[in-house]
Amino acid sequence: MSLLFEEIDSQPSELGEISLRRRRIPALGDRDIYEVKLGEEFLMSSMFVEAEEALSTLGLARTRGDKLNVVVGGLGLGYTAVAALQDPRIDELLVVDALETVIGWHQQELVPLGKILNADPRNRYVHGSFFDLATDSAGGFDPEHPGKRFDAILLDIDHSPTEYLNAANADFYTSENLALMAEQLKPAGVFAMWSQNLPEAHFEALLKTVFETVDSHVVSFYNPFLSGESTNSVYVCVKGDG
């Protein structure tokens, strides 16, 4: 281990070796940057979290009422979940992740936001495939309350609607399976999804076959590696009242 780089943990998974790393970049000062890597692919960095946080703020801004029950699909480094818990209307947050190792990093507080999530009684980790649970309308996301419906579902797993962490995830992005997931939303419930790309018209059209309203937001943030701006997107969809 050096001062500038440390591999905190590395474990096998169904998708390949997954590792948690911490590094410092001298040009950026004394800032610890946490990274999650799957095989040779970088999944998440604490250096760029603006869009992950915006997924929560933009999605929850469209919800109605109080005592919200919310699902976050994809734990990552915890930024979407922690941003959601900053909304005082949250009554319960289920964070679903297929990788038990990632949940363990948070439970063991190997990542900075683990302590925040563990200390909040509204937060609960669910180990399972988001995509399998999303299309299981009888069982659903909450193993303790089968068939439960939610005020919002916030998804950040795949890179985009056309670039998948796992090729099997492609099956989710159809009208049929999006509609199955929408059955787990309450009337006027919200589905929001992060993408690394700019909004894609064909995916917006697909979402409109299921949801009453669909809005796409471009989230901009400074990227020091480019000495300029980078962008991600957040799709925010609202189910009909009926």
Regions found by a protein language model. Give the residues of each.
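The AdoMet/dcAdoMet-binding core of the Class I SAM-like
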Residues: 49-185, 210, 215-220, 228, ...
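N-terminal auxiliary segments of SAM/dcSAM-dependent transferases
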Residues: 1-31
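Short, basic/glycine-rich phosphate-binding loops at helix/coil junctions
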Residues: 31-39, 156-161
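Short "lid" loop at the C-terminus of a central beta-strand within the Rossmann-like core
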Residues: 159-161, 196-201
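C-terminal lobe and adjacent flexible extensions of AdoMet/dcAdoMet transferase-like proteins
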Residues: 235-242
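Class I SAM-dependent methyltransferase Rossmann-like catalytic core
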Residues: 12-23, 36-67
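Short alpha-helix
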Residues: 178, 198-211
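Conserved beta-strand signature within the Rossmann-like core of class I S-adenosyl-L-methionine
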Residues: 188-195
